[in-house]
């Protein structure tokens, strides 16, 4: 599968989050070119501030492969991860991060911080942003615009 195809799947997860009135962020994890888990924001659904799409996908992937390390895995997320999610990605030893839209308020990869480039981290994550950035941004803008109307 191509990265754009994988981001389309992550966007579908983000749309699913919006159906549940969650901030529309979706995520998938691949290992050996196969999708092993999906995640979407579930903070409201689970009454927990930490149930971001990345956390959901990482926990699911770890459970599926029966290991807390996701070495050689790639994570695709529609929005630039926050600090908490970046640390989870590092701790899971995920190899590659691909994200869609930048997050100017809490994005810890390139927007408010370059967290994944910090020398104190014990694992290096390769990252590239901008995959289907327009589609990811529009989904978020539409979601928040609908919130302001109500």
Regions found by a protein language model. Give the residues of each.
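Zinc-dependent deaminase
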Residues: 1-20, 68, 81-150
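Small-residue (primarily alanine) positions within well-ordered alpha-helices
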Residues: 10, 14-17, 27, 37, ...
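Short, basic and Ser/Thr-rich N-terminal targeting/leader segments
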Residues: 21-25, 71
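Short beta-strand scaffold segments in enzyme catalytic cores
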Residues: 25-33
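Residues that line or immediately flank small-molecule/substrate-binding pockets and catalytic motifs
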Residues: 43, 77, 101
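Helix-adjacent hinge/juxtasegments
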Residues: 47-51, 55-88
């Amino acid at each position: 599968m191509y990265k754009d195809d994988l981001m389309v799947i992550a966007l579908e997860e983000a749309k699913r989050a919006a159906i549940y009135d969650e901030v529309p962020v979706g995520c998938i994890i691949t290992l050996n070119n196969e999708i092993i888990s999906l995640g979407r924001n579930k903070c409201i659904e689970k009454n927990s501030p930490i149930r971001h799409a990345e956390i959901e996908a990482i926990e699911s992937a770890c459970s599926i492969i029966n290991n807390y390390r996701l070495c050689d895995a790639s994570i695709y997320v529609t929005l630039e991860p926050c600090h908490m999610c970046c640390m989870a990605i590092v701790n899971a030893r995920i190899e590659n991060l691909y994200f869609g839209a930048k997050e100017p308020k809490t994005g810890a990869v390139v927007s408010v911080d370059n967290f994944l480039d910090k020398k104190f981290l014990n694992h290096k994550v390769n990252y590239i942003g901008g995959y289907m950035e327009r589609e990811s941004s529009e989904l978020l803008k539409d979601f928040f615009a609908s919130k302001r109307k109500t």
